[in-house]
Design a protein with these regions (language model features):
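Class I S-adenosyl-L-methionine
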Residues: 1-17, 22-24, 29-124
Length: 124
């Protein structure tokens, strides 16, 4: 059986790419997959823009759609879809770094993704 990959939450700061931590950058660059929230209207989001110059051409970029709505049904469906997309890589042993603008420990998109992963995939 393949060892599961690791899901990392990477705080990428407030917009200046030089504010990412050295450790965060190291993990980001060694991960096979880099996930990030899609921006409004499907455009590049802030987190993607911050990390773009640090990514290698061979890394898989995984944009995840988290709608800007308050409808719990719509949000739950989006979290489930995102968790399923990330799981496809983790179960084959790939590490996934989730780039998140700001601080992942404070009201972060990453926390919702991690909670959904745990509920959908207990082995996670």
């Amino acid at each position: 059986m393949t060892k599961l990959g690791t899901l990392y939450g990477i705080s990428v700061g407030t917009g200046d790419p030089e504010l990412i931590t050295v450790k965060g950058l190291r993990i980001l660059q060694r991960s096979q997959v880099v996930a990030f929230p899609v921006g409004k209207s499907g455009q590049a989001g802030m987190a993607e823009a911050i990390v773009a110059s640090y990514l290698n051409p061979d890394q898989i970029r995984l944009p995840l759609n988290f709608p800007y709505v308050q409808d719990e049904t719509v949000l739950t469906e989006a979290w489930d879809i995102a968790a399923d997309q990330v799981w496809q890589y983790l179960k084959r042993g790939d590490d996934v770094s989730f780039a998140c603008e700001g601080d992942i420990s404070f009201y972060s998109t990453f926390n919702y993704l991690a909670l959904t992963m745990r509920s959908r995939y207990p082995e996670f």
